């Protein structure tokens, strides 16, 4: 970062000459100089080039107005105002809090001024780099000799092998030098929360509005288990969202607890809804506890916020209403909610402490922010036993954590501080809103069909749109007022074939075809439903990527309307089974799958499958104990009714468990099996469209098989 912008005076000799001298002196200090044409040009430079590390300008011409505009973009950026002996200095105490320095126009002073600007630049960089990352950078620059782990010794070992050299050249020297051992004492300890690691966690807590934060280097799957192992002791009961991530199902297998399920809603599109308000009431919980063997009043609750499809809760209401001492919001998909006003009251860390309760929030920093994969955070607000919690933390944390991951978590937090962070999140929200409007415009202008978006009819302003009762667009029956809200950065595209109420048309385009078309053109969909596709507008999505997605959608429409051959339109799919797809065209394939979906009434089947829960014969923990003792056998999926599942069975999409370990399908919940068999049949009819079902495996004959507990006797 070495770019300085100069807004020089124009045509004034006694000002021009000192600035020309200064330019030469700054270049000698290693700076690169740019000359914006005017203040508008300058602000665009700063907005789109974060490597700018200073601005020089004439105070008489631009004064505080320019400073204020720059501060709206980056209040930390050094500003250098040049004045003469007659300049008016109307600067308040508040203005002096800016990173603003004054210099006089004078010949022969350029070298000294350039040295001072180098000093101020170094202070600026030192100020924006967070503590652990700063310490890691310093350590790498020191190039110390070590005789400890890791064995590649800062990348040296890779350069002793041809293939190692390829690896080194790809990842780069600094990445490998930053992969250091816990034996480096000056970097502190992640496990003991000392030194720069502790400073990083305190820095992150301040940034995210938490009282305490913990850095986790192996994903929110692990963060969820850490919280659960601390908050739900053996023999206790916990309330848990049936929409939970599979890591929480694994927690239930590890920990000897009794789950009581909070049952969420779904709409006909297969979009995951939230848990209705009535489920959080004391009366409802009492009924659930009474109906569950071994259950007591729950000590802990787990709620997925937001849902996979981008629905956020009114978390303030839940925190006040839910009568349990410990609440965990699994917010893996929304680590940005603290940094934009539209999300106020919709995150775990929002608001003040709640008397008598401790609130946990887990976030996948890597999912929607700028952190490396596996980067995760646990935030806490309320009283808790730090020593006991840290035992749970250490139980699930490697003694060789990745320091680049730690630095990336901290840097992700640093990127969100101040006006630069607000602007980063706001840009993401605005880009998603613009994309939504563009799809609407193309739909209105297109001949025939075009894609639609799952959203209210009018989306003029950026907000979290309420899923309000009585509105048709969302498709949720009996929606609660002021309870669920659609996140604008989670964009669900709808394909023709079915409306939000589940009414199916004669013809349709299953979303899986569109997903394959986009994938073959380098555009990866986050989630695919029967007639919907989910796209995430994270902070890394720029205008080019958004336009690329729009282009992909319009290209699909054009190719579909031309009824191109599968061989030409979807060559990768064609390669799956050339004989089957040899003469098939895209409209034949679309209508074939659409008719299969209509025949089996997939939307209705999906709703019924998730609405009727299987019978819990034993807890997931008890079922797991039986499995590791070898008391299991494998049967065909179609034989599952009446047998106790040994594993979690989870079709993707939608990625939510249908059957938990220890649960049994009965005559009442038979629809779960019908739904699974229907998903399997699509792949049997059309090669390349097989459904991924976690917990079920295909044998050599193509039969899906599952593990169940052996029957007694």
Predicted regions and their residues:
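Extreme N-terminal starter segment of soluble prokaryotic enzymes
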Residues: 1-3
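Non-catalytic terminal extensions of PLP-dependent enzymes
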Residues: 13-30, 39-57, 70, 76-77, ...
